[in-house]
């Protein structure tokens, strides 16, 4: 769902 996409984006930023 949309929330899954949001979490994926947040995870990507967290990897920075």
Curated annotation (Swiss-Prot):
GO terms for biological process: defense response to bacterium; defense response to fungus; killing of cells of another organism. C-terminal amidation enhances antibacterial activity. This increase may be due to stabilization of the alpha-helical structure at the membrane interface. It holds the Pfam family Antimicrobial20. The keyword Secreted applies. Expressed by the skin dorsal glands. Keywords: Amidation, Amphibian defense peptide, Antibiotic, Antimicrobial, Fungicide, Lipid-binding, Membrane, Secreted, Target cell membrane, Target membrane. It comes from the Eukaryota. One of its GO terms (cellular component) is membrane. It is found in: Secreted; Target cell membrane. GO terms for molecular function: lipid binding. The modification Leucine amide is found at residue 16. May be monomeric or may oligomerize as homodimers or homotrimers in Gram-positive and Gram-negative bacteria mimetic membranes. Belongs to the frog skin active peptide (FSAP) family. Aurein subfamily. Amphipathic alpha-helical antimicrobial peptide with moderate to potent activity against Gram-positive bacteria, Gram-negative bacteria and fungi. Also shows a weak activity against biofilm of both Gram-positive and Gram-negative bacteria. Probably acts by disturbing membrane functions with its amphipathic structure. Kills fungi via membranolytic action. Enhanced sterol levels in lipid composition membranes reduce interaction of this peptide with membranes, having a protective effect against the lytic ability of the peptide. Shows anticancer activity. The primary structure of the mature peptide is identical to that of aurein-2.5 from Ranoidea aurea (AC P69019). This is Aurein-2.5. It comes from Ranoidea raniformis (Southern bell frog).
């Amino acid at each position: 769902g949309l929330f899954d996409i949001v979490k994926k984006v947040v995870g990507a930023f967290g990897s920075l």
